[in-house]
Amino acid sequence: NRSALLAGLDTGEIDIAILAGEAAHDGSRREAFWSERVMVALSSSHPLAEREIVHWTDLRGERFLLPAADPGPEICDMLVGRLSVTGVQPDIRMHRCSRETILSLLGDGLGLTVICEGSAGACYPEVVYRPIHGEQGPMLIGYSGYWRDLNSNPALLRFLRFIKSRYALAFDISDSAVG
């Protein structure tokens, strides 16, 4: 839960929160870490499963199943923004269950869901994943790290150095920046 993670930063309960998209949060430093492709998960018998890529316009008129918990609300907002046309809203059903439960239901053709590429490694019977493309190519979602500048935990500094090296990032890290 995004709110719980950010609250944990404020209390010092956690050292870093990695979130999809961006969140305004006073008192925290934010740096972009990496991006992942946005994927649609659907039944292998769905007509769109035959395509290598799916465009946003291909998804109009489909039923989407999303978790009510994060990241469901953010995905819902994305779908409304991308698929709404004058007077017609996308068919989005929010469910009080996990993303994994929703993925396990898709093989029966009950609907589609939208996930980030990092979640597409799990195999579910009769479920396939296809990248979503927009007018500019693959749809990407960015992940950012949030931490308190005054956090003195040496593990945080090591983690930030690892992330910076792993993803060839340019943000500044110094011992004084985390303590």
Across the structure, where does each feature detected by a protein language model lie?
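Residues embedded in well-ordered beta-strands
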Residues: 32, 39-41, 47, 65, ...
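Short beta-strand and adjacent tight-turn residues that come in two discontinuous sequence segments
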Residues: 14-20, 95-97, 114-116
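A late-sequence structural motif
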Residues: 128-173, 178
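Short secondary-structure boundary segments
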Residues: 21-22, 44, 116-119, 143
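Secondary-structure junction motif
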Residues: 64-86, 153-160, 167-176
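Short beta-strand-centered segments that line the small-molecule binding cleft or hinge
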Residues: 2-42, 55, 78, 102, ...
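Short beta-strand-to-loop elements that line the ligand-binding cleft
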Residues: 1, 20-21, 88-98
